[in-house]
Amino acid sequence: MASGGGGGSKRCPKKQPTPEELAEELVKLRMENKALKSKLKEHVGDDDVVLTQAAKEAMVGSVVSGLTRSAAKQIEERIRKETLKATTKNEFEEVIKTLSFRVSLSYADLGGRASSDSSKASKPRGRSKHRAEKQ
């Protein structure tokens, strides 16, 4: 029984598209993509920005980094507080062995921002004097 994989068989190979057909399909897909992007912009509104995958990853990294800094600060404060009276290495290690942490974090700890304001258009940097002198 045939597998029906769509790849065709040796007797009836699948027809390969010509470069013209591929170019036509590409134009069609680009037009469809443009229409979908404009429809998405209408749906989202002017005050919001559609995230690209790269921008989303940058925002995730920014939030994780900020929350990690906040957690590290809380942990350090707790360790310093608990080991304040330790005067020897053994005392310090005994206190550390008994510590248990529960860190409370929230997005508000970051000041309420996941990223910089991407709505502002950034200006290109000017040419450096050093590079200008070389040319």
From Swiss-Prot:
Comp. bias (Basic residues): 122-135
A Pfam family reported for this protein in Swiss-Prot or TrEMBL: Herpes_BLRF2
Stretches for region Disordered: 1-20, 110-135
InterPro entries documented for this protein: Herpes_BLRF2
Superkingdom per UniProt: Viruses
Family, per entry: Belongs to the herpesviridae BLRF2 family.
Protein name: Gene 52 protein
Organism for this UniProt entry: Equine herpesvirus 2 (strain 86/87) (EHV-2)
Gene name of the record: 52
